[in-house]
Amino acid sequence: MKTTPFFANLLASQTRELTENELEMTAGGTASQQSPVQEVPEQPFATMRYPSDSDEDGFNFPV
């Protein structure tokens, strides 16, 4: 009995032909029932602080 890897079966089960409407959406066209993507306001990234040997807050970390 020949066995096929699990992920190969999973991938094969997930593939199917796209409909005309789905092709239109993936190609960047306008599909009638698809709502437009809302713009997300840009927010700056939070920076992570790393502790140093003698921190400004008075904590001393062992070297």
UniProtKB/Swiss-Prot annotation:
Belongs to the protease inhibitor I10 family. Keywords: Protease inhibitor, Pyrrolidone carboxylic acid, Serine protease inhibitor, Signal. Residues 53-63 have a biased composition (Acidic residues). It comes from the Bacteria. GO terms for molecular function: serine-type endopeptidase inhibitor activity. InterPro entries: Prot_inh_I10_marinostatin. Inhibits subtilisin, chymotrypsin, and elastase, but not trypsin. The lineage of its organism: Bacteria, Pseudomonadati, Pseudomonadota, Gammaproteobacteria, Alteromonadales. NCBIfam families: microvirid_RiPP (NF033738). The record marks M48, R49 as: Reactive bond. Residues 23-63 are annotated as: Disordered. The modification Pyrrolidone carboxylic acid is found at Q43. Residues 32-44 have a biased composition (Low complexity). This is Marinostatin-L. Residues 1-29 form the signal peptide.
